[in-house]
A protein has these predicted regions:
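Generic structural signal for secondary-structure transition and capping sites
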Residues: 20, 27, 42, 46-50, ...
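Short, hydrophobic secondary-structure boundary micro-motifs
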Residues: 31-32, 52-54, 97
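Basic/aromatic recognition patch in beta-strand/loop cores that engages polyanionic ligands
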Residues: 39, 46-82
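Residue-level recognition of specific faces of alpha-helices
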Residues: 14, 21, 36, 40-43, ...
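Enriched for short, Lys/Arg-rich terminal
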Residues: 71, 75-103
Length: 103
């Protein structure tokens, strides 16, 4: 049985902002970015538990897309088989950017 993947509005905004930036650099590159992020979502539907926990008390994990230097940061609610995407941020951004979304 697959997991349900739900993106928070902030994560959707992250994706849109990054895609817009990539499209400003090269036509169509933002669409490739979105395709790559959606591929990550598809993989998370299969088994989000493959990724290490990144928080001592919460079930927070992340996965990198294949081509772009971004992290898809998510929380796993095992008893409900739900994956909540909280942030899609550049890998170089400080952890405080996504941590405040889990408070």
């Amino acid at each position: 049985m697959n997991w349900k993947v739900v993106a928070r509005p902030q994560a959707e905004d992250d994706i849109t902002e990054a895609a817009d930036w990539y499209n400003s650099q090269s036509a169509g590159l933002g669409n490739e970015f979105i395709d790559e992020i959606l591929a990550v979502f598809d993989r998370l539907e299969l088994n989000p538990l493959l990724h290490c926990r990144r928080h001592p008390t919460k079930n927070i994990r992340w996965r990198y897309p294949e081509r772009f230097p971004y992290r898809v940061i998510f929380e796993v609610i095992e008893e409900e088989r739900v994956v909540i995407i909280a942030a899609v941020i550049h890998a170089a951004r400080h952890d405080s950017v996504w941590r405040k979304r889990f408070r």
